Swiss-Prot record:
Family assignment from sequence similarity: Belongs to the FtsZ family.
Protein name: Cell division protein FtsZ 1
Organism encoding this protein: Halobacterium salinarum (strain ATCC 700922 / JCM 11081 / NRC-1)
Region (Disordered), start-end ranges: 1-38, 358-396
Family annotation (InterPro entries): Cell_div_FtsZ, Cell_div_FtsZ_CS, FtsZ/CetZ, FtsZ_C, Tub_FtsZ_C, Tubulin/FtsZ_2-layer-sand-dom, Tubulin/FtsZ_GTPase_sf, Tubulin_FtsZ_GTPase
Any Gene Ontology CC annotation: cytoplasm
Taxonomic placement: Archaea, Methanobacteriati, Methanobacteriota, Stenosarchaea group, Halobacteria
Length: 396
């Protein structure tokens, strides 16, 4: 399959191990910008004030692996935080900030695949978590759902980020069927909790990756999953922080992602003569995007190409999407330039307000205001992180 998923497989097979700069363009929404004749230094000061502060928090093993891959790959304009209960794993991760969660609870030995322990560890370390995301305009929370630390801690981190006023986007994987029913049940509970506290939850179903990674060894299949998480976060972040033919700012991304609910992502690439059409078709046929996008209420599109990419090529990608999505849906798109890409074009499509058989939880209830609101009466008081969703239990 000619897609970024295939590219991720190539990365995983090649190696076991496989800087940030200030944002070039960012939007602050409500900031007052001085007008009139200004010097270059004064303009630089204004640009610094408008800079969007983005933080990526990797929770647990899979989330920390995502952060590590982003540090290796290089991400433009984001701070990287790795948060885990396993000190041995954390030592090997590259990140701007590392948080060993729940030292008293776990002694650095991990959560034992128990989400309850991961949640308690994150609550114990809420001070460090809040410090690591302080001042952020947008926070990505990445995790692999189904295990202990990522499943339990990701909702706590997302809740803290949203309470501090950040646009909060969770990007998570759901487990392979072969991982067992316990992990699937815990992933469902973790996803439900994330839906209550994050603005948007982008779900990457590992089962759908089997279409591409079925013949790979198990360890490399998980590396592909980590790679897809990394590329998803990087693609959204660099829409804001990297210059392109069509630039987006933070306000644009907030328009789609704020209260976006559950979202799915498609990744595609092409280097053919008709690469614009082929890359978007590859993204829409991606096994990760197992939805009927015609019912989506909004979409965020990132088109990445080399220095020779034309505005006509980028527009061709978006025109293809307009033909397939609800005419009333809001589509926000931008481009970024990657000097390392020659003739290729990459397309990332995030669609929100969708239903999919690959998504666990209350899809049906989420569509109607009545039942969904009645089933979650606790969020109003907000006594402490994690307690607003006590009705959904993890299993051991």
């Amino acid at each position: 399959m000619d897609s970024i998923v295939q590219d991720a497989i190539d990365e995983a097979e090649e190696s076991e191990d496989s800087a940030s700069e200030p944002a070039d363009v960012a939007g602050g929404g409500g900031d007052t910008v001085p007008t009139g004749t200004m010097t270059d230094n004064e303009l630089e000061d204004v640009l610094q004030e408008l800079q969007t502060n983005i933080t990526v928090v990797g929770c647990g093993g899979a989330g920390s692996n995502t952060v590590d891959r982003m540090a290796t790959e290089g991400i433009h304009g984001a701070d990287l935080v790795a948060a885990n209960t396993d000190v041995q794993h954390l030592v090997d991760i590259e990140a701007d900030t590392k948080i060993l969660m729940g030292q008293q609870k776990t002694k650095g030995r991990g959560a034992g695949s128990l989400p309850q322990v991961g949640e308690e560890a994150a609550i114990e370390s809420q001070g460090e978590i809040r410090d690591s995301i302080a001042g952020s305009d947008m926070v990505f929370v990445t995790a692999g759902l189904g295990g202990g630390t990522g499943t339990g801690s990701a909702p706590v981190v997302a809740k803290a980020a949203r309470e501090q006023g950040a646009l909060t986007i969770a990007i998570v994987t759901t487990p392979f069927t072969a991982e067992g029913e316990v992990r699937r049940t815990n992933a469902e509970a973790g996803l439900e909790r994330l839906r209550d506290v994050a603005d948007t939850v982008i779900v990457v179903p590992n089962d759908r990756l089997l279409d591409s990674v079925g013949k790979l060894p198990v360890r490399e299949a998980f590396k592909v999953s980590d790679e897809v998480l990394m590329r998803s976060v990087k693609g959204i972040t660099e829409l804001i922080t990297k210059p392109g033919l069509v630039n987006l700012d933070f306000a644009d991304v907030r328009t789609v992602m704020e209260k976006g609910g559950v979202a799915m992502i498609g990744l595609g690439e092409a280097d053919s003569d008709a690469k614009a059409a082929d890359s978007v078709q590859s993204a829409l046929r991606s096994p990760l995007l197992d939805v009927d996008i015609s019912s989506a209420n909004s979409a965020l599109v990132n088109v990445t190409g080399g220095p020779g990419m034309s505005i006509e090529e980028a527009e061709g990608v978006v025109e293809q999407l307009y033909d397939r999505i609800d005419p009333d849906a809001r589509i926000i798109w931008g481009t970024s330039i990657d000097e390392q890409i020659q003739e290729e074009m990459r397309t990332m499509v995030v669609v929100t307000g969708v239903d999919s058989p690959q998504i666990y939880g209350r899809n049906e209830a989420a569509e109607g205001d009545g039942p969904a609101q009645e089933s979650t009466p606790e969020p109003e008081p907000e006594p402490q992180a994690g307690s607003e969703i006590e009705d959904i239990d993890y299993v051991e």
